[in-house]
Amino acid sequence: KVCRQRSAGFKGPCVSDKNCAQVCLQEGWGGGNCDGPFRRCKCIRQC
């Protein structure tokens, strides 16, 4: 199963999946990407 959660530390609009993924990795997640109509940074990991 894959768990997704909005990044706690990402600031501003999410325009780069790479930047989002780096923030998520620092938060202990497996990665992340920009998602949804408001382009929020969502972190992902196996759970």
From Swiss-Prot:
The keyword rRNA processing does not apply. Belongs to the DEFL family. The lineage of its organism: Eukaryota, Viridiplantae, Streptophyta, Embryophyta, Tracheophyta. It holds the Pfam family Gamma-thionin. Keywords: Antimicrobial, Disulfide bond, Fungicide, Plant defense. This is Defensin-like protein 2. Disulfide bonds join 3-47, 14-34, 20-41, 24-43. Inhibits protein translation in cell-free systems. May inhibit trypsin. The record marks 11 as: Interaction with trypsin. It comes from Triticum aestivum. It comes from the Eukaryota.
